[in-house]
């Protein structure tokens, strides 16, 4: 909306440094209370006169004094793509998938500031550690997810060194949970970096062991295996996060899943090539996390949707064979576009009749859930 306002009020496109100045100044004018707006404008005009020129200061003064009125007119005109800084083609796709009313709600929430959530591992040791940090958090409606109170990052950050806590949106929990991982099982997480969903899978395995200790042997948890795969410069962060899991066997494998032979790499590392469950957190358009990644809305193109959908289909077809008979394949994205999500799940099911879709769900954003996306589980 700010860029649109500058376009309306400037007779010609300002130079880059003037664009940067105007964006910052207009943003401050917008959020200022009405009785403080004149002071904010005068401050920016004075700064421009001192650091640019008198003529440019006059230009800034003219733009800032008219920007609030221009923005209000834009809002009344219901130009959604301008108001919410979301490409019009994407808004039209959402209207097609979800209807106008639900799309309006999505747009509203995606433009609100993101929250920071800490996820706590589900065991008593984690709870005891957290007792010393509760004052820095607020509870959420999601079990084991706690919202960090503003201004408390420095106070809360030591939790991340313990191995019991991880920063992630509550929505990230839903897809890994569909694997229903069990202690003693073997699981494969593809496109795993930075490791948030691998950490969830590991905690789910641990929770199963703790909840059903009487039916497992003492060594069952340690015998569980989770192999997390990614490649290139994404590997180091994945390793750092998975090294904090000390209660079961976690391996990290460097493999370009579209270009290299994963089976060969697994065998070379002495790892199995058949798993009780495979999780694919596929590359996607990121349309479900525009609240968390606001820059993505300026980069995304409509062609990206189809390109991502094609990559996702290739991953599904290529790695379904790593699931044991009776096992589960979970496909997940952080997109809310049907072409990348339900259509891909249906495509896979149609072309692989020995697989059955057990769940297929799109998660839309809400006030307490920054992230959203899609997951589907298919059983062999």
Where are these regions (language model features)?
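S-adenosylmethionine
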Residues: 1-380
């Amino acid at each position: 909306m700010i860029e649109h306002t500058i376009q309306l009020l400037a007779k010609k496109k300002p130079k880059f440094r003037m664009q940067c100045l105007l964006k910052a100044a207009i943003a401050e004018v917008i959020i200022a209370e009405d009785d403080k707006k004149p002071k904010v404008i005068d401050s920016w005009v004075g700064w421009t006169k001192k650091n640019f020129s008198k003529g440019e200061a006059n230009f800034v003064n003219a733009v800032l004094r008219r920007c609030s009125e221009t923005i209000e007119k834009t809002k009344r005109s219901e130009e959604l793509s301008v108001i919410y800084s979301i490409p019009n083609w994407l808004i039209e796709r959402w209207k097609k998938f979800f209807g106008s009313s639900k799309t309006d709600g999505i747009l509203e929430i995606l433009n609100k500031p993101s929250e920071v959530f800490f996820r706590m591992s589900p065991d008593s040791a984690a709870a005891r550690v957290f007792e010393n940090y509760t004052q820095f958090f607020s509870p959420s409606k999601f079990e084991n997810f706690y919202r960090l109170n503003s201004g408390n990052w420095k106070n809360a950050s030591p939790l991340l060194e313990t191995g019991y806590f991880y920063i992630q949106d509550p929505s990230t929990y839903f897809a890994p949970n569909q694997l229903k991982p069990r202690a003693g099982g073997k699981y494969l997480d593809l496109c795993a970096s930075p490791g948030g969903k691998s950490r969830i899978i590991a905690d789910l395995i641990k929770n199963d062991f703790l909840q059903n200790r009487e039916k497992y042997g003492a060594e069952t948890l340690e015998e569980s295996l989770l192999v997390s795969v990614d490649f290139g410069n994404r590997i180091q962060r994945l390793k750092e996060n998975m090294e904090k899991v000390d209660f079961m066997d976690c391996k990290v494998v460097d493999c370009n899943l579209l270009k290299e032979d994963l089976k060969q790499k697994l065998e070379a590392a002495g790892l199995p090539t058949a798993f009780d469950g495979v999780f694919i957190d596929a590359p996607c358009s990121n349309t479900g996390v525009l609240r968390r990644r606001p820059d993505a809305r300026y980069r995304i193109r409509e062609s990206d949707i189809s390109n991502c959908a094609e990559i996702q289909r290739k991953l599904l077809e290529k790695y379904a064979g790593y699931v044991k008979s009776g096992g589960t394949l979970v496909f997940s994205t952080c997109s809310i576009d049907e072409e990348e999500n339900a259509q891909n799940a249906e495509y896979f099911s149609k072309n692989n009749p020995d697989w059955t879709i057990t769940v297929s769900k799109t998660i839309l954003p809400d006030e307490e859930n920054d992230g959203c996306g899609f997951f589907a589980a298919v059983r062999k």
